[in-house]
Regions:
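Extracellular beta-strand solenoid repeats
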Residues: 40, 63, 86, 109, ...
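Bacterial N-terminal signal peptides
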Residues: 8-16
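Polar, glycosylation-prone regions of secreted, cell-surface, and some intracellular proteins
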Residues: 31-34, 42, 48, 65, ...
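Intrinsically disordered/low-complexity terminal segments and short unstructured peptides
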Residues: 6, 22, 39-41, 62-64, ...
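Bacterial N-terminal signal peptides that target proteins for export
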Residues: 1-8
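Conserved anchor residues at repeat-unit boundaries in beta-strand-based tandem repeats, strongest
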Residues: 25-36, 48-59, 71-82, 94-105, ...
Length: 231
C-alpha cells in the first residue's frame, strides 16, 4: 500500500470514528428526525442530560450533570434551565428557586457550604430586589439588593448585638442611618463608605447627646452636648 492510500485511509478513519467520539451521543425518542420525548444526551466532556426533549431541544423536566460535578434538576426550555429548579454544587452548596434563560431569576434560596444563607430575589444570576442574607458568624441583613450587594434601604443585625438600619450603596452604609451599639449607645446621622460622615448625633447610656459634623468617623470642628434634662 503506497503512502497516498495510507493517508486516505487514515483520514477516512478519523472522520468516521475520531469526529464521532467528539459528537454528543443520544439515546431516546425521536420525531421527524429530531430528539422529541424522553432520552439521554451524553457529551464528550462527560456532561449528561436525562429528561424531556422537544423539537431537538432540551425542553420540559430534566437532570443535567456538569463536567465539574454540579447537578441541575428542574425545568428546561430550548436547551436552557427555565422555571423551577435545583442546582446542587459539587462542594455541597444548594440553590433552589426560579430560572430564566439559564440564570437565577426571580425568588430563590441559596445555601452555601461556607454557611452563608440567602433567601430572596435574583436577576441575571445576581441578588437583586428584596432579600435576607445570613452569615455564619451570626450577622443578618434584610433589605434591598442590587447587583449582588446590599443597596437601598436595609437593616443589618450583627452577631455581637449591635445593629444598623438605614441606607446602603454598593454594599456599604451610605446616607442616613441609625447605628445601635452593643453597649447601648447609638448614632443617628449620615454615613459614607461605612463611616460616620456628615452631621449626626451620638446618644450615650446616661441619656447625654452629642451632635456634630463627622468626617471618616472623626469629629470635624466643634460639637454640642445636650444633657439628659435638656440643658
Amino acid at each position: 500500500m503506497n503512502y497516498l492510500n495510507q493517508t486516505v485511509l487514515f483520514l477516512v478513519f478519523f472522520l468516521l470514528f475520531g469526529c464521532a467520539a467528539k459528537t454528543p451521543q443520544y439515546k431516546g425518542e425521536m420525531k421527524d428526525g429530531n430528539k422529541h420525548g424522553t432520552g439521554t444526551l451524553t457529551y464528550p466532556d462527560g456532561s449528561e442530560y436525562i429528561g424531556e426533549f422537544k423539537d431537538d431541544y432540551k425542553d420540559g423536566f430534566g437532570t443535567y450533570t456538569f463536567p465539574n460535578g454540579n447537578v441541575y434538576q428542574g425545568g428546561f426550555e430550548e436547551d436552557l434551565p427555565n422555571g423551577k429548579g435545583e442546582l446542587k454544587y459539587a462542594d455541597g452548596s444548594i440553590y433552589t428557586g426560579n430560572y430564566l434563560n439559564g440564570k437565577k431569576d426571580g425568588y430563590g434560596e441559596y445555601i452555601e457550604l461556607n454557611g452563608i444563607h440567602y433567601k430572596g430575589n435574583y436577576r441575571n444570576d445576581l441578588r437583586e430586589g428584596k432579600g435576607v442574607l445570613v452569615y455564619p458568624q451570626g450577622d443578618r441583613y434584610e433589605g434591598d439588593f442590587k447587583k449582588d450587594l446590599p443597596d437601598g434601604f436595609g437593616k443589618i443585625e450583627y452577631g455581637d448585638g449591635s445593629s444598623f438600619e438605614g441606607n446602603f450603596l454598593n454594599g456599604m452604609k451610605n446616607g442616613y442611618g441609625i447605628y445601635n451599639y452593643s453597649n447601648g449607645e447609638s448614632f443617628k446621622g449620615d454615613f459614607k463608605n461605612n463611616k460616620k460622615h456628615g452631621y449626626g448625633t451620638i446618644t450615650y447610656n446616661d441619656g447625654t447627646e452629642f451632635s456634630g459634623t463627622f468626617k471618616d468617623d472623626i469629629l470635624e470642628g466643634e460639637g454640642r452636648y445636650k444633657l439628659k434634662d435638656g440643658k
